[in-house]
């Protein structure tokens, strides 16, 4: 008999790890996926011991074309039913646009964009059969504004695409029992910034603008379980998103440029 599972990408650190912990705390069986197999193995054992749920993992690099197939085939072979899909994996390129190689950009777009499409496409058919499924798109506050000056040109626009893709899933499948939630964190304290070479910039962000990954993850999971279309973490971030939507684009661009000393996750 098949058992239901929640699949989380980018699950070995930061928001992804805390989402896995929160779902496990709520009693969901977990499938972890990320690149670091040693971390996956350790976290899987911890979750099973702490929360008395079933947890398994598959190591995959979403920058590789074959990764979504590898993940889906693993779930099929193990007879897992994925009724919760958390598209969380991501990173940023700490270079200006003209300094970034095309191969590097292609890998970036595959992790943050193409793999989300592929995984969602692969798991939706089984959700449709059961008329039940929840999908989380971990986007960013950066999706509401142009990228900050000096921080590249792809991260914010790709996250804007993620939002629109999540909206499209809702439009096409909500009436059939499948919901998609766009989760938009602001400055969140995780390994994201050090891994992307941005820790110095993150250190300059005022403390009142930062959130911890556990708080963000709990709010994100709660929003997904309620079937919300979009969830922005924190009152300040909600205000920033509102301002970005109502002010003229020229003003928003100037405001975004002033954030060169910081970075959205």
Regions found by a protein language model. Give the residues of each.
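Substrate-binding pocket helix/loop in short-chain dehydrogenase/reductase
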Residues: 96-98, 104-109
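Residue(s) in the substrate-gating loop at a strand-loop-helix junction
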Residues: 140
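Conserved NAD(P)H cofactor-binding loop of Rossmann-fold oxidoreductase domains
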Residues: 88-93
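C-terminal helical subdomain
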Residues: 182, 203-239
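Active-site helix of classical SDR
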Residues: 120, 158
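Conserved glycine-rich Rossmann-like NAD(P)H-binding loop of the short-chain dehydrogenase/reductase
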Residues: 26-43
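Conserved glycine-rich cofactor-binding loop
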Residues: 12-14
């Amino acid at each position: 008999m098949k058992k239901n599972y929640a699949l989380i990408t980018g699950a070995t650190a930061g928001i992804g790890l805390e989402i896995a912990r929160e779902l496990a705390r709520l009693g969901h069986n977990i499938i972890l996926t990320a690149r670091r197999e040693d971390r996956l193995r350790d976290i899987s054992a911890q979750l099973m011991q702490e929360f008395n749920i079933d947890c398994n993992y598959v190591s995959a690099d979403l920058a590789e074309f074959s990764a979504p197939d590898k993940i889906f085939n693993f779930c099929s072979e193990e007879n897992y039913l994925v009724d919760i899909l958390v598209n969380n994996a991501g990173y940023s390129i700490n270079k200006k646009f003209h300094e970034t190689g095309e191969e590097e950009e292609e890998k970036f777009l595959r992790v943050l964009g193409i793999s989300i499409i592929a995984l969602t496409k692969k798991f939706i058919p089984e959700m449709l059969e059961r008329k039940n499924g929840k999908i989380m798109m971990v986007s960013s506050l950066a999706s509401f504004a142009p990228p900050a000056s000096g921080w590249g040109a792809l991260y914010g626009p790709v996250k804007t695409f993620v939002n629109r893709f999540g909206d499209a899933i809702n439009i096409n499948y909500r009436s059939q029992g499948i919901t998609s939630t766009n989760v938009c964190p602001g400055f969140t304290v995780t390994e994201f910034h050090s891994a992307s070479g941005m820790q110095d910039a993150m250190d300059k962000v005022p403390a009142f603008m930062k959130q911890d990954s556990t708080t963000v993850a709990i709010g994100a999971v709660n929003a997904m379980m309620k079937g919300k279309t979009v969830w922005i973490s924190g009152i300040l971030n909600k205000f920033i998103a509102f301002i970005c939507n109502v002010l003229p684009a020229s003003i928003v661009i100037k405001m975004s440029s002033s954030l060169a000393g910081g970075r959205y996750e």
